[in-house]
């Protein structure tokens, strides 16, 4: 823990952790370097890594809560200091670590008076709490508070919608991203007759992953995205004589089926890697559209049925894809 003196060898390319610390159970910091890089490479890698760190790494959150004592989200319960809304906000802040897939059930059942904290959550075996001291509620009277919880592993974030209330349960805004922030900076220097660069990456996490683990996972995700390009030519040769269905079926420019490298690559390009406006991105994520291939397999009419999606958004998507 602490800062090391940075020394860079001109060859070969190397990476190093130059600073690492835990500011709290829910705030880790790491600083890394990669060098030597040719001019322009540091920015290319830095931008890609930042996007992968913030958008491609999965995390685990509480996404839904249910209790018979809750008439509606903005109600209060006798014997509990916090309102229902405040309890839901406290549940949103709970940081979990897991390797689960899909959703799991958890629960809280505590008799007052006393404080309810994260350590009172009864979790499935595959899930653990990063900070057991996180506050949930204060029971001021001898009442019993029982809450059923839903835990989910995903990536990005999900904003609750008014029509997402089911059987007296309440959705919770989910921020799945274990990386709180990521920045990159570049140090340029001259080595002989060459202009070279050092890339510095700064990563802050919520404690469910260390910055080093986040860096490794983001790197793996980027590699997985690029691997298909190595096989694209072979894939095209094997399929050039086969009949195919139209890949794009909205907008006149996309009416004819075309098996190009770009179209094949769309399967592996996620919408959060693009420059889509936040409103358009949220519309698509709510409709479970994660990749551009999934997006373009919808007709324009189907897209227009998505809540808050507008006709001009179609043109914006086409401009982003440059098709």
UniProtKB/Swiss-Prot annotation:
Record region (Alpha N-terminal domain (alpha-NTD)): 1-233
Entry's family note: Belongs to the RNA polymerase alpha chain family.
Question: Which InterPro entries does the entry link to?
Answer: DNA-dir_RNA_pol_insert (IPR011262), DNA-dir_RNA_pol_RpoA/D/Rpb3 (IPR011263), DNA-dir_RpoA (IPR011773), RBP11-like (IPR036603), RNAP_asu_C (IPR011260), RNApol_insert_sf (IPR036643)
Instruction: Report the locations given in the UniProt record.
Output: Plastid, Chloroplast
Enzyme class comes to: transferase
Instruction: State what protein this is by name.
Output: DNA-directed RNA polymerase subunit alpha
Gene Ontology CC terms, in alphabetical order: chloroplast; DNA-directed RNA polymerase complex; mitochondrion
Q: Function, please?
A: DNA-dependent RNA polymerase catalyzes the transcription of DNA into RNA using the four ribonucleoside triphosphates as substrates.
